[in-house]
């Protein structure tokens, strides 16, 4: 069960607790930016995640559909996450054994642009009961993965992976000139 052990990266990274309740992983989820495969807790720079990632969903039946949610629970900053969760991407009706490009994009991908601190970017995969209509939220900030799953009767997640991202040096901010 994901989130049941102290050494589980989803517990250590506080994904279980801040975003999700403990769950059982039953499907494979592969997320990659270029050649870089996302593994729990890895560090990716904002310049590496500007383009929509390649997402491959496991499963063994194309008649089973999945919903993918990507959120930042640390918006606008980890010390003051008053926009928690910030919705970066929402794709539904992804057939099993395929990828996000085969699903219905409800909210287009917005690349992470953290300004302060280390942000966790979380990909959560849910198995749907069947094809369904999902409406785009009115805004991206203060999204709740738990409430979304309840609203659309998605149950517990079937897979999750996350990475850490922080502002790159030299990417803006105060400059002092002699």
From Swiss-Prot:
Its main location: cytoplasm. The keyword Calcium does not apply. Expressed in leaf vascular tissues. Specifically expressed in the phloem including companion cells. It comes from the Eukaryota. One of its GO terms (cellular component) is nucleus. Disulfide bonds: none annotated. PANTHER family: PHOSPHATIDYLETHANOLAMINE-BINDING PROTEIN, PROTEIN FLOWERING LOCUS T-RELATED. Interacts with FTIP1. This is Protein RICE FLOWERING LOCUS T 1. It comes from Oryza sativa subsp. japonica.
